[in-house]
Structure formats: structure tokens, C-alpha cells
From Swiss-Prot:
Keywords of the record: ADP-ribosylation, Cytoplasm, Differentiation, Disease variant, Host-virus interaction, Intellectual disability, Isopeptide bond, NAD, Nucleus, Oxidoreductase, Phosphoprotein, Repressor, Transcription, Transcription regulation, Ubl conjugation
Subunit annotation: Homo- or heterodimer. Heterodimer with CTBP2. Interacts with PRDM16; the interaction represses white adipose tissue (WAT)-specific genes expression. Interacts with GLIS2, FOXP2, HDAC4, HDAC5, HDAC9 and ZNF217. Interacts with ELK3 (via its PXDLS motif). Interacts with RBBP8 (via its PXDLS motif); the interaction is disrupted by binding to adenovirus E1A. Interacts with FOXP1, HIPK2, PNN, NRIP1, MECOM, ZFHX1B and WIZ. Interacts with ZNF366 (via PXDLS motif). Interaction with SATB1 (non-acetylated form); the interaction stabilizes its attachment to DNA and promotes transcription repression.
Cross-link named Glycyl lysine isopeptide (Lys-Gly) (interchain with G-Cter in SUMO), sites: 428
Official protein name in the record: C-terminal-binding protein 1
Length: 440
């Protein structure tokens, strides 16, 4: 539906037509953009939407049918949607990030185009906090390097050998941990760190006064104060235009000599060239990164490839089986609220409400646009081909398409699952609250 279609309907530019979801209308199409398993989402959406997946590794791999017909999209952090990408979607009304961070979506442009963007702000708080403490403890106690020494055949028996291989290991009690961004994950990290004996400072210009008293923490008023007084600095803020490369050559020089750095938030917060140089010079004693400027991360390239005393993990601090299921369920429920309610009024976690041009019901759409028999199907390249993945498809739709086929060949009929009831219902780092949490 181009702008001419909208004008013919008497709607202003940027306001997308409502989409009907009723017994006489096809179900709206919802697509998982960068994944292939929709078994968690299907039970929540199957009676109100057609669910498909793209398994796209880049926006160029999003199928034309999804671009033309999808009214809802689910996505992880592995692809980025710019304004140019968003303009390719002809019927899209809502995007839900399966996770808390949404810096991979241009939320202002989405709002200008009439597309609501939502997230799951409480996702993986415990997992990310636990992973952060794991990295911090690893830096202090050097477990990774000790393990590596044994794997490499290093003989460790005498006190002198232990002293040599464990060089740099330090006592934790009495050390000062500086937390940048005291949202959900930042607070969870603070409570865990106190149990290990850390003195905890935090810097968060967005947080109202009083939290430090409730949690027994010390608040500092500037980033410079935190960097100067911290033995270990950990980042727990969202990425925005104000804090890109928050840790850079200038701020590294404001840190204590030999401090540690941990980042499980967003890769863009750290200038990796500056970090690599600081590690080589010993200004930073060690660093642990779960997120990187360029992902997927590889040790074989980039500025960190030769950096010493560095631990890297592949953006997995958020993950546990339980957390993954919980965030997917909540993301699907948000899509359901959009379909059965009003955008943005019915949405629980809309992050671009201020940018949306209007709040409208989902309503009518040409019946030919959506194919309800494709619940669970895969929209994958090459263009013009629709297939069903051999795994990850719910039993209700498994095997409905034996192999990939041309769209021009038509689609095999399949019985819909019965309707089911709804399931139960300034360098200023932006902290991980509802509007921007520690990132997944």
C-alpha cells in the first residue's frame, strides 16, 4: 500500500490504514524477521494472526512478501532497521524487539511512518547481571587465564609457579565498583557486587534522588568522578547519540591506573581502538566484553585482535532458556495486544509513542494480501520462493508445504487451529528502565 492508496482512503501521509481481523477477513501477517523458531509465539498468536519467519541475516534478505504484507514484525538484535529499510514495508504497523535494547531500530522514523516500536524491558535482568558478575570475578581472580595455562600444558606446582601463572589476581573485598546506568540490570549488579564485598558507586543522571539510600549505594554527580574513584567500571546504559564511545581515549585517561572495564550493554559505548591501546599500555589492567562495535565478533580482525588481558563473549550475557522463552512470550503478547486493541493505547511497552502520528485501530485490508494458511511458514530468499523449514514449525502446521515452491504455483490449503482464548494477561548514559534498559 503506497502513499497514493492512503490518500485515496482519505488518510494523511504517515498514518497507515487500520487492518481488520475478524471471521470474514484473513488474519494479519506477523513475521519473525531474524529467526526461524516461532514455536513459542505460535500458541499466543495462532488464533489472531498468520505467523511466518524470514530467518534473515540482513535486511536485504527480508522477503518481498513480508515487505508488502506484514503488519507486525518480531525481531532480535542481529539486524538493523534504518529509515530506508522501514520505508520498504508497505503495511507494517508494529515492531516488537525480542529483548530490551532497541538501538538497532530508527524509532523516530518508525513513528513518522506510523509504525509502533515496542520492547521487552524486563527481559533477562538476572542473566545479564549474573554474566556481568561472572566477568568481573573472572578479571579479579583470573580463572580464564589459569584455565588457559593448564590447557597449554603449563606446569603449575611450586608456589613460584602459582605466583607466576596467577599474577594479577586480586582480592575483591574493599574494591570499588563503578556502575554507569542504574536501571534494572545496574541495580541487580549492584546488589550482587555488595554481597562480594565491593563498595559500589553509580552514575545515572536520569535517575531520581533516593534510590542510593534505599540500596545502600554511593551516587556521584559526574562521569569523571565515577571513573576516577572506581577500581572496576561496568556499563549498564542504553546506546544513543549522546553516549556513543562513552569510553574513549579521553575518558580512559580519567580512569584509575590499572582499572578493569566490563561491558555487557552495547558495543558502541566503547571505542575499541582506545581500549586496545589502553590494554597494551597497561592503563587498563583487563577488560571483559560481551558486546562489540562490530558483531558477530571475531578475534582475527579488528582493533582488539592483539589486545592482552581481554575476555570476549558473543553477545550472550542475556541468554538462558528461561529468559529466552519469557521474552518471546511477552513479545508475542505485545503483538496480540496490537492486533486485538488499539495502537498505541493498548501497547504495554511502546518506546516511540511520542513519535507516532496517530493512534488507530487495526482494520480492513484487501483479502488477497494475507495468506492465513501460511501459519508457521518461512519467507526466505531467493525472492519468489516460499518454503517451510524442516524444523521449528508447530505441529499444527508441520508438513503443510513439503518443499520450497514458487509463489506463482499457489498455496496448499490447511485447516486452521481452533480459535483459542487470549493467553493470560551531556555525556548521559540512558539507563535500563522502561524506555531503555540494559541491552540484549
Amino acid at each position: 500500500m503506497g502513499s497514493s492508496h492512503l490518500l485515496n482512503k482519505g488518510l494523511p501521509l504517515g498514518v497507515r490504514p487500520p487492518i481488520m481481523n475478524g471471521p470474514l477477513h484473513p488474519r494479519p501477517l506477523v513475521a519473525l524477521l531474524d529467526g526461524r523458531d516461532c514455536t513459542v509465539e505460535m500458541p499466543i498468536l495462532k488464533d489472531v494472526a498468520t505467523v511466518a519467519f524470514c530467518d534473515a541475516q540482513s535486511t536485504q534478505e527480508i522477503h518481498e512478501k513480508v515487505l508488502n504484507e506484514a503488519v507486525g514484525a518480531l525481531m532480535y538484535h542481529t539486524i538493523t532497521l534504518t529509515r530506508e529499510d522501514l520505508e520498504k514495508f508497505k503495511a507494517l504497523r508494529i515492531i516488537v524487539r525480542i529483548g530490551s535494547g532497541f538501538d538497532n531500530i530508527d524509532i523516530k522514523s518508525a513513528g513518522d511512518l506510523g509504525i509502533a516500536v515496542c520492547n521487552v524491558p524486563a527481559a533477562s535482568v538476572e542473566e545479564t547481571a549474573d554474566s556481568t558478575l561472572c566477568h568481573i570475578l573472572n578479571l579479579y581472580r583470573r580463572a580464564t587465564w589459569l584455565h588457559q595455562a593448564l590447557r597449554e600444558g603449563t606446569r603449575v606446582q611450586s608456589v613460584e609457579q602459582i605466583r607466576e601463572v596467577a599474577s594479577g589476581a586480586a582480592r575483591i573485598r574493599g574494591e570499588t565498583l563503578g556502575i554507569i546506568g542504574l536501571g534494572r540490570v545496574g541495580q541487580a549488579v549492584a546488589l550482587r557486587a555488595k554481597a562480594f564485598g565491593f563498595n559500589v558507586l553509580f552514575y545515572d543522571p536520569y535517575l531520581s534522588d533516593g534510590v542510593e539510600r534505599a540500596l545502600g549505594l554511593q551516587r556521584v554527580s559526574t562521569l569523571q568522578d565515577l571513573l576516577f574513584h572506581s577500581d572496576c567500571v561496568t556499563l549498564h546504559c542504553g546506546l544513543n547519540e549522546h553516549n556513543h564511545h562513552l569510553i574513549n581515549d579521553f575518558t580512559v585517561k580519567q580512569m584509575r591506573q590499572g582499572a578493569f572495564l566490563v561491558n555487557t550493554a552495547r558495543g558502541g559505548l566503547v571505542d575499541e581502538k582506545a581500549l586496545a591501546q589502553a590494554l597494551k599500555e597497561g592503563r587498563i589492567r583487563g577488560a571483559a566484553l560481551d558486546v562489540h562495535e562490530s558483531e558477530p565478533f571475531s578475534f582475527s580482525q579488528g582493533p582488539l585482535k592483539d589486545a592482552p588481558n581481554l575476555i570476549c563473549t558473543p553477545h550472550a550475557a542475556w541468554y538462558s532458556e528461561q529468559a529466552s522463552i519469557e521474552m518471546r512470550e511477552e513479545a508475542a503478547r505485545e503483538i496480540r495486544r496490537a492486533i486485538t486493541g488499539r495502537i498505541p493505547d493498548s501497547l504495554k511497552n511502546c518506546v516511540n509513542k511520542d513519535h507516532l502520528t496517530a493512534a488507530t485501530h487495526w482494520a480492513s485490508m484487501d483479502p488477497a494480501v494475507v495468506h492465513p494458511e501460511l501459519n508457521g511458514a518461512a519467507y526466505r530468499y531467493p525472492p519468489g520462493v516460499v518454503g517451510v523449514a524442516p524444523t521449528g514449525i508447530p505441529a499444527a502446521v508441520e508438513g503443510i508445504v513439503p518443499s520450497a515452491m514458487s509463489l506463482s504455483h499457489g498455496l496448499p490449503p490447511v485447516a486452521h487451529p481452533p480459535h483459542a482464548p487470549s493467553p493470560g494477561q551531556t555525556v548521559k548514559p540512558e539507563a535500563d528502565r522502561d524506555h531503555a534498559s540494559d541491552q540484549l
